[in-house]
From Swiss-Prot:
Family stated for the protein in its record: Belongs to the replication factor A protein 1 family.
Species whose genome carries this gene: Tetrahymena thermophila (strain SB210)
Entry protein name: Replication protein A 70 kDa DNA-binding subunit
Top-level taxonomy: Eukaryota, Sar, Alveolata, Ciliophora, Intramacronucleata
Residue range(s) of DNA binding per entry: 240-322
Domain of life the protein comes from: Eukaryota
Length: 671
């Protein structure tokens, strides 16, 4: 009997230190499909956790029913230790325990664990004994064998008290990871009929949150006669029946102002018409977890209302499941499309209104590092990442990801992303693309799911440097400032383009430069800021006072305002860098330099060592150059490091290889 996880399994799997060892690990989050036969997982060995784990091959074909916190034995994995990025690729596994309801130990992030000398005082590999005695057998994977299955919630649970749920329903959609659903992109996997949960007759109490879906009744006595199409639904109270495919499933959420719960699914019928189906309160509890994206279902006896909220619901009408409703889970029906994409281009957003939805297929130009933002609404921290992308309209735009999605984003330059139901926003009279409540993101999706991908790839491979140099920033109107952007460039080209600022002072220039830091000015390095508004604050006796927020602090937040000289093989230039980039360059927070300034004995030497250590290092810089005016109205050109990435020789070599391959494709197409 397996009684514990394998200590340091994560590090061993990453470095392939013992290929014959079968490591026991915990899957913290259920596998998430990211491409055909590829599932992403977050795993733990009790001492550290790792987000970039993947199931491929045999593991990918059987992993869809794995639950959060289950324990598996890694039987086969791929030696990927020579790859430039740390990741774990598992090709086969054995399920050990599926009934685990808690995290084993208190694992920390792998990088933190590694930097601390593989030490974590709160880590543990011991599996609690109650799980060993209760269910030591592997749960069998239930496959649907009937052509159709009738799913109805158990009557005995209708009046069951609702367990407490985190109050996330009313939170701002754009900053919650639950708003963005990464949909199964493998058409073969989407075609599979998902198994219905059946009664396992175990005594798990599920910590009081067991929805008891295991007692659902299964029947095959339904039929598909008198089907109605979504476009013909009527809110007349008469019985209606529809046959649809699930294209999106939302999470179970709770209301803010009154007790209650909700989840919804988006569906599509054979004509490509869409609508949203909602489940409320005890009905939501009973059906939550039963559906999977790609399933074909028949729904009978439901309520229909006119859709008055197109921001959250699809179609002209909304459907609500009630106690009399019946749902049949059907076999695959190829006449019903997988998903509907009303593709438009970045330039089309100028003709849309704020709040409108748009479907885009874009090519990644660059992405910034994950940043931490303080939300003004509640002073809570949120992670964000900006994706700079473009399409065939040769216009680029920034699309911002928030929360865990920003942290998990793993695409690179040239990758293709599909945004379904992105939301048109507006900031300072300029249109922008926002990630809304119902936005779906597909990273490098299969061409079978979106046939348009083939044409986009072909177009991207055919681009030459002259065409790339004409890509412009999307603007809110034709009279707005012009922005010039290119992929990889050099400092001598940047300096030539800066001359154009004399005739077009509103222009902004974006360049990605591979260069190194030559010198960092030692004063000023930072300013003392308020923790809330980030504005400059002054010392008042023993406290620091923010006039803007009317708050006092024992210490300030020392934030970088660096001035540094960078160079490449063509030229040098003075640039500015602010706090997040400064921390990346110097490796410490600005507070360290403030402490050094206060240390009259050793402070000067400490500052000198830190600054010297940061010089002569090579990076990839994303630079923004624009013209600014000082208090006297004098114009000056200013270049700021917008983002920075470590120089990776293996990645640079791959870029050269990719460029050669792209050139060969162009040569073949243009003999």
């Amino acid at each position: 009997m397996v009684t514990q996880l394998t200590k340091n399994a994560i590090d061993s799997l990453i470095n392939s230190t013992n290929p014959d060892e079968q490591y026991v690990i915990q899957v913290l989050k259920a596998p998430q499909s990211v491409a055909e036969n590829l599932f992403k997982i977050c795993i733990s060995d009790g001492f550290c956790k790792f987000k970039k784990g993947y199931f491929v091959s045999d593991a990918a074909t059987k992993c869809q029913d794995l639950k959060d916190l289950c324990i598996i034995k890694c039987k086969k994995y791929i030696d990927d230790s020579n790859h430039d990025k740390e990741r774990i690729i598992i090709s086969n596994y054995e399920l050990i325990y599926s009934n685990i309801q808690e995290q084993i130990g208190k694992p920390i992030e792998y990088k933190q664990y590694k930097s601390s000398g593989f030490s974590n005082p709160e880590g543990s590999t011991v599996i609690p004994s109650q799980y060993l005695s209760r269910n030591a057998q592997i749960l069998q994977q239930n496959q649907v064998s009937q052509p159709k299955q009738m799913v109805t919630p158990p009557v005995s649970n209708i009046n069951k008290p609702t367990p407490a749920v985190n109050n996330t329903f009313a939170q701002k959609p754009a900053v919650t990871n639950q708003n963005i659903q990464r949909v199964n992109q493998n058409p073969q996997q989407m075609n599979k009929t998902a198994p219905v949960k059946q009664n396992n007759n175990n005594n798990n109490n599920n910590n009081g949150n067991n929805k008891n879906n295991s007692s659902l009744q299964i029947s095959t006595d339904g039929d598909e006669q008198n089907l109605e199409y979504i476009r013909n639904l009527q809110p007349n109270g008469q019985p209606q029946t529809i046959k649809v495919r699930i294209t999106k499933k939302g999470d179970l959420k709770s209301f803010k102002e009154k007790q209650g719960k909700l989840f919804s699914i988006d569906v599509i019928d054979k004509f490509g018409d869409e609508c949203s189906i909602s489940f409320f309160n005890e009905i939501a509890e009973q059906y939550d977890g039963l559906f999977k994206v790609g399933q074909v279902i028949v729904l009978k006896q439901f309520s229909v209302k006119v859709n008055n909220n197109h921001q959250y619901n699809k179609g002209d009408h909304t459907v609500t499941v009630n106690k009399e409703s019946k749902i049949l889970i059907c076999q695959e029906d190829p006449s019903i499309p997988m998903i509907k994409l009303n593709r438009q281009f970045i330039q089309d957003m100028q003709n849309k209104q704020k709040g409108d939805l748009i479907d885009l297929i874009v090519v990644v130009k660059a992405d910034t590092e994950v940043k931490t933002m303080i939300l003004k609404k509640d002073n809570q921290q949120q992670s964000k990442r900006d994706i700079i992308s473009f399409d065939e309209s040769l216009i680029e735009t920034e699309i911002t990801l928030w929360g865990e999605t920003a942290k998990d984003y793993d695409a690179k330059q040239g990758d293709i992303i599909v945004f379904k139901d992105a939301k048109i926003g507006e900031f300072k009279d300029k249109k922008q693309i926002n990630i809304g409540y119902g936005t779906q993101i597909f990273m490098n999706p299969d061409e079978q799911l979106f046939p348009q991908i083939h044409d986009v790839k072909k177009w991207y491979l055919s681009l030459n440097s002259d065409q790339l140099s004409t890509i412009q920033k999307a603007q809110g109107n034709d009279t707005g400032p012009r922005e010039v952007t290119s992929f990889e460039s050099s400092l001598n080209i940047l300096k030539e383009e800066i001359k154009n600022l004399q005739t077009d002072p509103e222009m902004k220039i974006w360049k990605e430069i591979r260069g190194q830091i030559m010198y960092i000015k030692d004063t000023p390095l930072y300013y003392n800021a308020c923790f809330s508004c980030k504005k400059k604050i002054a010392r008042n006796n023993e406290v620091w006072t923010c006039i803007n927020c009317n708050k006092d602090f024992n210490e300030p937040d020392s934030r970088y305002i660096l001035s540094l000289n960078i160079s490449d093989s063509t030229d040098t230039i003075w640039v500015s860098a602010f706090d997040e980039v400064g921390q990346k360059i110097l490796g410490v927070k600005g507070d360290v330099f403030r402490y050094a300034d206060e240390d009259t004995e050793h402070g000067t030497e400490t500052k000198k060592k830190l600054l010297m250590a940061a010089q002569n290092k090579e990076y990839r810089f994303l630079l923004l150059t624009k013209q600014e005016r000082d208090q006297n109205g004098n114009a000056r050109d200013k270049t700021v490091i917008h983002a920075i990435k470590d120089f990776q020789p293996a990645y640079e070599a791959k870029k050269i290889i990719n460029s050669l391959e792209k050139f060969m494709v162009i040569e073949e197409n243009n003999p």
